[in-house]
Amino acid sequence: MQIILLEKVVNLGNLGDVVKVKDGYARNFLIPQGKAKRANQANLAEFEARRAELERQQAEKLAAAQEVGAKLEGLMVQIARKAGMDGRLFGSVTNADVAEALAAQGFEIERSTVRMPDGPLKQIGDTQLEVALHSDVVVSITVSVLGEQQQ
């Protein structure tokens, strides 16, 4: 299916690009999330009429992400969980837990933006994680998992 991108999409293209993608990817992900429209004459004309507005919105989103990224870069988040004597957690720390801890510090981010390349954290200690605020803004934070005292 041919689509027009309404914003930058990682590994696909930039604002205004007409690209060919699989039908399911377009119908189930890109179009419902407002990232793309079908490429037909009417939508192409509408896009060209709104191009300046869309570019301005993209620039505003990027500036906001860079501003939050500057505050978030290098931040340390502490999360306490019950752990055994050997340092293994009873359970794990997921990206939702990290997003919740960041929200407690005043940063409203989606849990899907927290990247955990090795999966959920299952050990006590410090771990470097990435937060993708925008396709062009990826910052690094440190998550310190602490063991709670057992009674």
Curated annotation (Swiss-Prot):
PROSITE patterns: RIBOSOMAL_L9 (PS00651). One of its GO terms (cellular component) is ribonucleoprotein complex. Keywords: Ribonucleoprotein, Ribosomal protein, RNA-binding, rRNA-binding. InterPro entries: Ribosomal_bL9, Ribosomal_bL9/RNase_H1_N, Ribosomal_bL9_bac/chp, Ribosomal_bL9_C, Ribosomal_bL9_C_sf, Ribosomal_bL9_N, Ribosomal_bL9_N_sf. It comes from the Bacteria. GO terms for molecular function: rRNA binding; structural constituent of ribosome. SUPFAM superfamilies: L9 N-domain-like, Ribosomal protein L9 C-domain. GO terms for biological process: translation. Belongs to the bacterial ribosomal protein bL9 family. NCBIfam families: L9. Binds to the 23S rRNA. This is Large ribosomal subunit protein bL9. It comes from Azoarcus sp. (strain BH72). The lineage of its organism: Bacteria, Pseudomonadati, Pseudomonadota, Betaproteobacteria, Rhodocyclales.
